[in-house]
Design a protein with these regions (language model features):
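N-terminal glycine-rich phosphate-binding loop and ensuing alpha1 helix
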Residues: 1-61
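Structural beta-sheet core signal
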Residues: 5, 51, 103, 128-131, ...
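Conserved beta-loop-beta/alpha segment of the NTase-like Rossmann-fold superfamily
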Residues: 60-62, 67-148
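Catalytic-core segments of class I nucleotidyltransferases/pyrophosphorylases
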Residues: 100-102, 109, 115-122, 135-138, ...
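Short acidic-glycine loop/turn motifs at beta-strand connectors
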Residues: 146-149, 302-304
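Phosphate-binding and adjacent anionic-ligand microenvironments
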Residues: 243-334
Length: 334
């Protein structure tokens, strides 16, 4: 089965965490989001994969190669300018041809049963099937209103609280029949939720919504990223995929997720952190370091064999705190 993986994101809101990494390579407790997604695709039977790239495409190409180390066949489409989600997929028409295919975002952690989603789509005759997920804070997502048969009647994009009538959000994971893509113009920025789906509804093309079990989290903000990292440590997402290639930019994995002191056998040269049990390859704090600033407490202790990082955070709102933490660490290194 075929899948298109949208991996062109830059991750501006995560810049204090990602640096120059494309957002799909952001690590979740030592494993890039993209590695986890490719492992999920393989386990779900989607072994023919096309990734759409835009920001620093060579970084992802070097990291993933031809996909053989993940058990998939991986090819790429590179955008010189962003085309929107639907526009990027339309540019892959030679890849999907006349086959139904999966679309999945490269910057969300997920454990859905994608094969079940695919089978429900094929049995329904829908033009598009949308994976839905309940979210207690749905304001930043698109809400989906369905009829009793599960077909979509309305999309409400990023509502305010008075307009929240459901907690089911659009995850950006779709099964699409090729006829739906004929509504997308070529070489024109075009989005699924804002552009294509209203056209399909106006044309009476059926869109099926399927509430999914499992785990899903869009890591687009520091707060969501922090929450997702803790969810991984709590076992809500599957463990590190086996045989995933190691990235030189990825953080050293924690062998004991219950520990807040994370050892790394090679002394780091630069270091960034957001939450407990995470350390990115980085700085050499040879003499040790202790920082206590507001809700953050950080300790880097000197050791003959290892360097360690300990972080305690009393709040999940990490944007300003991460920047402050990095500033303190840089001052110490001067």
């Amino acid at each position: 089965m075929k899948a298109i993986l949208l991996a062109g994101g830059q991750g501006r809101r995560l810049r204090s965490i990602t640096g120059k990494l494309p957002k799909p390579l952001v690590p979740l407790v030592g494993v890039p989001v993209l590695d986890r997604l490719l492992d999920l695709l393989r386990r779900s039977g989607f072994t023919d994969v096309c990734a759409t790239l835009c920001y620093r495409p060579e970084t992802i190409q070097e990291h993933c190669g031809d996909g053989s180390s993940y058990g998939v066949h991986l090819r790429y489409r590179i955008e010189t300018e962003p085309r929107g989600t639907a526009g990027a997929v339309r540019a892959c028409s030679d890849f999907y041809g006349q086959d139904d295919f999966l679309v999945i975002s490269g910057d969300a952690a997920c454990s859905f049963d994608l094969l079940r989603l695919y089978r429900q789509h094929q049995s329904s005759g829908a033009a598009v099937t949308v994976a839905l997920y309940p979210d207690a804070e749905p304001l930043q997502y698109g809400l989906v209103l369905q009829d009793r048969q599960g077909y979509v009647r309305h999309f409400i994009e990023k509502p305010d609280w008075p307009h929240v009538v459901t907690d089911l959000v659009n995850t950006g994971i779709y099964i699409i029949s090729p006829r739906a893509m004929t509504y997308v113009p070529e070489d024109t920025p075009f989005d699924f939720a804002n552009d294509l789906f209203p056209l399909l509804l106006a044309a009476n093309e059926p869109i099926l919504g399927v509430p999914m079990d499992g785990y899903w989290c869009d890591i687009g903000t520091p707060r969501a990223y922090y929450r997702c990292c803790l969810d991984v440590l709590d076992g809500r997402l599957s463990p590190v995929p086996p045989e995933a290639p190691e990235s030189p930019d990825a953080p050293a994995p924690c062998t004991d997720p219950l520990r807040r002191s994370v050892p790394c056998r090679d002394r780091a040269h630069r270091m960034r952190t957001l939450s407990e049990a995470m350390m990115e390859a980085g700085a050499d704090f040879t003499n040790g370091l202790h920082v206590h600033d507001g809700s953050w407490e950080l300790t880097v202790r000197p050791d003959a064999e290892v360097s360690a990082l300990q972080v305690e955070a009393n709040t999940p709102d990490a944007a300003a705190e991460t920047a402050r933490l990095l500033e303190l660490m840089e001052q110490h290194g001067k």
